From Swiss-Prot:
Subunit annotation: Homodimer.
PANTHER family membership: METHYLTETRAHYDROFOLATE:HOMOCYSTEINE METHYLTRANSFERASE RELATED, UROPORPHYRINOGEN DECARBOXYLASE
Gene Ontology cellular component annotations, sorted alphabetically: cytosol
Organism domain of life: Bacteria
Name recorded for this polypeptide: Uroporphyrinogen decarboxylase
Binding of substrate, residues: 27-31, 77, 154, 209, 327
Gene Ontology terms: biological process: protoporphyrinogen IX biosynthetic process from glutamate
GO MF annotations in UniProt: uroporphyrinogen decarboxylase activity
Summary of the function given for this chain in its UniProt record: Catalyzes the decarboxylation of four acetate groups of uroporphyrinogen-III to yield coproporphyrinogen-III.
EC numbers on record: 4.1.1.37
UniProt organism field: Pseudomonas syringae pv. syringae (strain B728a)
Keywords: Cytoplasm, Decarboxylase, Lyase, Porphyrin biosynthesis
Site features described as Transition state stabilizer, chain residue numbers: 77
Pathway annotation from the record: Porphyrin-containing compound metabolism; protoporphyrin-IX biosynthesis; coproporphyrinogen-III from 5-aminolevulinate: step 4/4
Amino acid sequence: MTALKNDRFLRALLKQPVDVTPVWMMRQAGRYLPEYRASRASAGDFMSLCKNPQFACEVTLQPLDRYPLDAAILFSDILTIPDAMGQGLYFETGEGPRFRKTVSTLADIEALPIPDAQQDLGYVMDAVSTIRRELNGRVPLIGFAGSPWTLATYMVEGGSSKDFRKSKAMLYDNPQAMHLLLDKLAQSVTSYLNGQILAGAQAVQIFDSWGGSLSSAAYQEFSLAYMRKIVSGLIRENDGRKVPVIVFTKGGGLWLESIADIGADTLGLDWTCDIGEARQRVGSKVSLQGNMDPTVLYARPEAIRQEVARILASYGSGTGHVFNLGHGITPEVDPANAGAFINAVHELSAQYHV
């Protein structure tokens, strides 16, 4: 494969020296960009974007053509795995993801197949290899998947949820069923991420979007334990380089020490954590990614710059920090403000890497 022209993202994840703090944004290929909206209109709908490797490649590269980002992230969706299990994923306009089938009993879960990454999710692997080829070494490519708990909530609820009442009822009423579902999902995520790595992903991230909804005890048993299982099963070196693993639990600030213990290279932080305190708490065990509040991007560029400066100062000197938002960029953000954010990270961080 082509040598990387910019590897500071991978170097920071592995706590190797960098010249400036690398930066990318969760959902950087998204609705805030007019070129993304045009591609989505051409594709017809969101899933057609995901399932066509050429469209997926096109939208993955759009933010890189606009901004000096230090990483690309595969354009896809965390719900491709439940879709490949036969749940029938579709998107209602303005309502987010829905499933035609849900799981509610042990029998439902026992009947679920474990998808084959190449056969059932081959379109994702094709997208990864297409993007790697088109990137031609500009920056590394990140692959990703949802955490078992997060995927399970969508499969049990049938879509997004405010209180996760069906998922949590199953967790407490029928833990055997929930554990079986999570185990099947952990196996599926492991093979899916390994497929992405073999197709060319140079780092992978596990998105535990709803882990923070759980009690401390339930988080350890029903979310963290399964992410640990995935991390232990991932390919960690490919194409002559280490493949770093990032784990991100939104709302996981209470459990940073536990998350840092599961064997991942990097811990993603949401905006409710102080990154300097997080660095003290986890020590040298992992690198950190984050963690500006995405809504800061609605402020003026000078205010964005001030917040970037504050977070950089909180983290302090040295490598081991990848700058990101504390969650995904939102659709109404002015693209110029995203550019101001990225430029501020590069301009203001050099002093911390002398």
